[in-house]
């Protein structure tokens, strides 16, 4: 065999080996895909309800005066009385949080009834917000009454929540998984196959939905508070959990 023929055979052999080396992984991947077991994927849902055990109040004190200093002083005095009353009612310091202080000029704008040529500042308003967590729902009406009497004249929101809903959410999780298993069994029976082990599970939890009281309704309650104790209907909070579960098919 001459040198040219030997070189040709060697090159051909190398090419065959190279093609084979690249073909093996592709063959292995294709074989793995064709042997992957059949599966059933379902979504299970679980819900639990719980009566609220805590109220979150968002209140505000608003004062107006000729000067910003006078408005600030009046606002501080009113807020101090409100905070003192909260503490006397058994609200702990950890459940009281003052928010931002808002100072705004009060303008009078030119119209047919005045001789103003441009907007004029006639005074200032100062408002301070306060978030209160009330852990005894029976005291919410009394606390609102006292707050309005002492100076709260603006209301934001009232939410009835659960302080620690972990146990309720865990029960909702159990119900969601049980619901997923029931769905998978129904599908497997309808398809005439057996249900195998769980190979994948993930949670799609939704945030709890506290029992809110609309802002307009809350302001109406505040306005009525000096004459009558504010009635509070606690209702129930709903906790929903969804799970995605994948089963093997036997």
UniProtKB/Swiss-Prot annotation:
Superkingdom of the source species: Bacteria
Keyword annotations from UniProtKB, A to Z: Periplasm, Signal
GO cellular component: periplasmic space
Main location: periplasm
Subcellular location: Periplasm
InterPro entries in the record: 26kDa_periplasmic_antigen, SIMPL/DUF541
PANTHER family on file: PERIPLASMIC IMMUNOGENIC PROTEIN, SLR1258 PROTEIN
Full protein name: 26 kDa periplasmic immunogenic protein
Gene it is expressed from: bp26
